[in-house]
Amino acid sequence: RCLRLAALHIADPARLTPGEFAFWGDGLLNSEIAAEAAFALLSRIGAFPELFAAWIAPDAGWLRQYAALMAAARVPHPSPAWAVPAAAVVHGAAAASIPEAHLLAHGAVALFTALGTRNEENRQAVLRAAGSLGQLPAEACVHEELAWRLEV
């Protein structure tokens, strides 16, 4: 565990290419490592938009999705276009009743907050994406968190 965490801090973000996404994704063994990967490495790579697209996909698995959401919340210039797939991930997990749905909801909230506090255009994109969510428990979590984080 410690070696995996250390590797995330030692790796050079400038050298992480799309060809290595699978390698790093396979190393995400739990939510702690996924969150640390987002913080220490993934949010700093030049190919982050490509990583986000690959790891937010429905078949990417919840650990990669969580890492993508947490990293997206930390990139210097998050894209408002990421709000819709973030909401879709939460909805998919909530509808499938996977145990990690709330974790994905918290990842989406982190991204939504990073986006929604930048400017009004991003805020509106977040509100539209979050507004597409229903009232399943993980979806309700997103609504509740955004209500106070974005003062909705």
Name the predicted role of every residue range.
Residues 1-152:
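Alpha-helical scaffold domains
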